[in-house]
Structures are given as C-alpha cells and as structure tokens.
Regions:
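Conserved Walker A/P-loop ATP-binding site and its immediately adjacent core
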Residues: 70-160
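Short loop/turn elements that form and flank the Walker-type P-loop nucleotide-binding site
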Residues: 58, 85-86, 181
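Residue-level preference for the first positions of well-ordered beta-strands
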Residues: 61-63, 88-90, 184-185
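Conserved pre-motif I regulatory segment
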Residues: 25-65
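Short His-Asn-centered micro-motif
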Residues: 65-67, 92-95, 188-190
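Helicase-associated low-complexity/disordered flanking segments
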Residues: 1-37
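Conserved RecA-like ASCE ATPase "motif II neighborhood" in helicase/translocase motors
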Residues: 167-171, 180-193
C-alpha cells in the first residue's frame, strides 16, 4: 500500500528531529537566528524540507507556502545544495530578489559560500599549478584567478576573521563569492527584467 509506505517514509524523515520538535524552550525565529554568534544554521523545519526532497527521494517538486520571514529562501537553498551533483542549479526569481537570494546563499548555502569564516588570500604567483588548484577547489575560471592575481580560500582550522578584513578585501571576497555562485547557479528572472 502506497499510503503505508509514505507514512513510514515521513516518520523516518521526522525521527532525527523528534527532540527538536518537542523542545518548547527553543524560541528561535528566522529573524533572531545567528544574532549571538553570527553563524547561521538551518532551523528544524528547513532541515525536514531539505531531507524530504533530495537526490535520494522520489520527490521532485514542493510548494513552500509560509508567511513572511519564515525561511523560504534558506529552505530552497538547502534543497538546491542537497540536489547538486556537479550540474548547474537554476533559480527562478523576480529580478528584484536576485541580489537578496545571492546574499542568502552566502548565509545559509554551502560552507564555501559563507562569508563568516576565516579567509586567507592565496597569491597565484604566476604559477599555473596554483591557478589550476584554486580553479578546481573554488570552481572559478583560471582567467578570473589570473586577473585578480590569486583568490580567497577558507581556513577551517582558524576562527572567523571576516570582520577584521579591510573594506577592499571584503569587496574582493564578495566579488569572488558572487563569481563562484554565478558559476554554480543560473538565475532566470521570471518577470522578464
């Protein structure tokens, strides 16, 4: 019976989050999450949505219909990040929301796109091997790395230094992240603008 199989599937998805769902002391909203530490992680309902629709489930469509500020953008990013397998991800959004979507990817997307971590500048030193390694690791064109004479790379062994970077460095890093996101995501503006 398909209904019985579906119920078992849903129960299996909810099981890891049972304690989070029953915790009434946890008063986190999309507006307050990450305010103390600057680090953003998915909320429980976003994790459930991410686990419901991914490469390993038979479902390929989902309508997210929540109120304003409930985390729909981060939910859609979590789904997209869970579905990536080397192919481009297509995002359909009004032109007016494209910049917001890019900034949200930097907050709740793949760790490589997040600004709040330790960043170190790696100079290419006109070395083709360094350029190729950076290109592969960051999914950036070699021309981009040559033009900028290097690239930003994360160091997961050190603490967040983003707020210590100069304004010029932050701009350079954000331009690189935008380029990396543009290489992974294709934006289509459904209002034609």
């Amino acid at each position: 019976n398909n209904r019985e199989i579906f119920v078992k599937f849903i129960n299996r998805i909810f099981e890891p989050y049972k304690h989070e769902l029953l915790d009434t002391d946890n008063d986190i909203t999309c507006d307050t999450i990450g305010q103390a530490s600057g680090d953003i992680s998915l909320m429980t309902h976003q994790k459930i949505i991410r686990d419901y629709i991914n490469l390993y489930t038979p479902y390929r469509g989902l309508l997210l219909y929540h109120g304003l500020g409930s985390g729909k953008t981060c939910s859609s990013i979590a789904i997209a990040e869970g579905m990536k397998n080397g192919s481009k991800i297509i995002i359909m959004t009004p032109a007016s929301l494209k910049r917001n979507y890019l900034e949200e990817i930097k907050k709740c997307g793949d760790l490589i796109y997040r600004t709040n971590q330790c960043w170190e500048w790696i100079s290419n030193e006109n070395n083709i091997q360094i350029e190729e390694a950076l290109s592969t690791a960051l999914s950036l064109p070699i021309e981009y790395i040559k033009r900028n004479k290097g690239a930003w790379l994360t160091n997961i062994t050190k603490t967040n230094n983003y707020h210590e970077l100069t304004t010029t460095d932050k701009k350079s890093l954000n331009n690189q992240l935008d380029e990396m996101i543009q290489n992974k995501y294709t934006f289509i503006n459904h209002n034609g603008i």
